């Protein structure tokens, strides 16, 4: 569905992208055009190395997974009901507000790769996949969240979950 959202946004606002590119002498597919491509998917801040961006994604995804497990674990005494989804939503908003400027907080490969692929097809070309880096940056939002989710689950299971009474 994320790719569908990217397609819909492009269909609705494509002429505005073209106007912006013309007004700012921007060539689609250049490093400068990442500003517009980032509407569809995530790219790291220019000051971050690829390893730093991967580290950010691993940490924020592990925090998200650990807290999701804590909020949904039947053995920890947290009241169930509508509170867990609300708290998870607040957590995602806090993560986004605090780390969004660093990497765009992908936290989910599906949230990033499909829209990147669409941006590639819509004329941004290789810059959509590399993010202006020497390596294919699209790999980071695929692999780092997987590592982070596994790490968050393992940390919860072995440090917290094993001490719960159930």
Regions found by a protein language model. Name each.
Residues 1-166:
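Membrane-interface helix-loop junctions and terminal tails of multi-pass membrane proteins
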């Amino acid at each position: 569905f994320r790719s569908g959202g990217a397609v819909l946004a492009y269909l609705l606002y494509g002429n505005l992208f073209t106007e912006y590119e013309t007004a700012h002498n921007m060539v689609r597919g250049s490093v400068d055009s990442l500003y517009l491509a980032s509407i569809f998917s995530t790219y790291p801040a220019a000051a971050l190395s690829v390893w730093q961006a991967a580290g950010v994604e691993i940490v924020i995804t592990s925090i998200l997974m650990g807290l999701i497990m804590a909020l949904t674990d039947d053995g920890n005494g947290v009241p169930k009901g509508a509170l867990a989804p609300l708290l998870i939503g607040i957590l995602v908003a806090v993560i986004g507000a605090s780390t969004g400027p660093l990497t765009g907080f992908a936290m989910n490969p599906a949230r990033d790769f499909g829209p990147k692929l669409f941006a590639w097809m819509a004329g941004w070309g290789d810059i959509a996949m590399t993010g202006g880096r020497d390596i294919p940056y699209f790999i980071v939002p695929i692999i780092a969240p997987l590592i982070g989710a596994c790490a968050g689950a393992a940390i919860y299971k072995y440090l917290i979950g094993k001490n719960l009474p159930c």
